[in-house]
Regions:
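Trp/Phe/Arg-rich N-terminal binding region typifying the photolyase-homology
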Residues: 1-175
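Glycine/tryptophan-enriched, flexible segments
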Residues: 12, 146-148, 153-325
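Charge-dense, low-complexity intrinsically disordered segments
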Residues: 22, 61, 65, 213-220, ...
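Short, glycine/acidic-rich beta->alpha junctions
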Residues: 27-31, 119-120, 247-248, 279, ...
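Alpha-helical packing segments of well-folded alpha/beta enzyme cores
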Residues: 31, 70, 74, 222-229, ...
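Contiguous, well-ordered alpha-helical segments that form the cores/surfaces of helical PPI scaffolds
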Residues: 32-37, 250-254, 265, 346-349
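Extended low-complexity intrinsically disordered regions
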Residues: 328-330
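Helix-hairpin-helix/helix-loop-helix acidic hairpins
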Residues: 332-349
Length: 349
């Protein structure tokens, strides 16, 4: 957990607020559990806020349908746990202003949010003063070993692996699901749209990519996918994962991406599986070491969005070969439409 400002907890506050972003689940969520623990100590109710961008950049109907299916389930499970859930459609490129308005409505004693490795210190500072004098804490709930503990950018799996392995025993434990002492009472003055697939109609989304009906969003679907993977495919993971014609991978990526299942839940289930050790270890290498290497890169490399972030030798190589003759040249549309000479590329598309 990171304290983002120096404000004291407001004794006049009426609740604790958890601003959900990357960790979109009601179970096995370290940030949510931290918020519950704080609410219980303060003897206050807990409410979760989620901001939906009306004009999300680079998002389409498939992404948002999957995400909203998960949010609908999350909202239901939170209510079952006597925790409030408020969603707001937010104009502009950020939900910060809408969240500030929400905080003015509910007057929190404390705000807890998901850690975001892409959010630079300057952005955290701006957010921390949106709703003074409320303290702001962030919790790294999307990885197993908190990314802040690694302190600097790691350049390869071989450098980050021993650092993660040294801390795994400390952090790879069941998250648990506490009970709240003071239930949230709905207030009709606090507006929140119903969270369902129909909500996508109120957002400006790219409709050229239809929902993937074979993938349904939500923690229940994620847990079912995890059980199927362990039962049917984990034992062939090493031999089959790099063959696109063999269904050997976990199919958990979209659920991990939207935080609908946590890496703790997956890793503990894989550890306890009856599959061969080499298959279990290979999967955990990808899901823990390689995934957290990517998070480390985004957290500590300020130029992670551009080619300027790559190593100098790689940039030199690209420049040296920029004018090399190519046997085939394709437009972006041809590549996307699988109109190339390469059957493997075409099959992947």
């Amino acid at each position: 957990m990171v304290v983002r400002n120096g404000e004291a907890i407001d004794p006049r506050g009426r609740c604790v607020v958890y601003r959900m972003r990357r960790t979109q689940r009601a179970l096995d969520n370290p940030a949510l559990e931290t918020a519950i623990a704080a609410a219980n100590v303060l003897e206050q109710p807990l409410v979760v806020f989620f901001g939906l961008l009306a004009n999300p950049p680079m998002a389409n109907l498939r992404h948002y349908t999957f995400m909203i299916e998960g949010l609908a389930e999350t909202a239901q499970k939170l209510v079952q746990r006597r925790i409030g859930f408020v969603a707001r459609i937010c104009a502009g490129a950020s939900s910060d202003r809408e969240f500030a308005r929400f905080c003015a409505e509910v007057r929190p004693a404390l705000v807890i949010c998901d850690e975001d490795p892409a959010r630079r210190d300057a952005k955290w500072t701006r957010e921390a003063v949106l709703y003074p004098p409320t303290p702001l804490w962030s919790v790294d709930a999307d990885v197993i070993v908190p990314s802040k503990l690694l302190e600097k950018e790691q350049f390869a799996a071989r450098t980050i692996r021993p650092r993660i392995q040294r801390r795994l025993e400390e952090f790879l434990k069941p998250v648990g699901n506490r009970s709240v002492r003071v239930p949230w009472k709905d207030d009709r003055r606090i507006k929140s749209p119903s969270v369902s697939r129909e909500l996508t109609e109120q957002l400006h989304l790219d409709g050229s990519v239809n929902p993937a009906n074979e993938f349904r969003g939500g923690t229940d679907a994620a847990l079912s996918a995890l059980r199927r993977f362990i039962r049917d495919r984990l034992g062939n993971y090493v031999s089959g994962r790099n063959h696109p014609d063999i269904e050997a991978t976990s199919q958990l990526s979209p659920y991990l991406h939207f935080g609908q299942i946590g890496p703790h839940t997956v890793a503990l289930a894989i550890h306890g599986a009856a599959a061969p050790a080499r298959d279990r270890e290979a999967f955990l290498e990808e899901m823990i070491v390689r995934r957290e290497l990517a998070v480390n890169f985004v957290r500590y490399n300020p130029r992670f969005r551009t080619l300027a972030s790559i190593e100098p030798w790689a940039r030199r190589t690209l420049a040296e070969h920029a004018r090399d003759a190519r046997s085939h040249l394709y437009t972006e549309k041809q590549l996307a439409n699988a109109e190339t000479h390469d059957p493997l590329w075409n099959a992947a598309q």
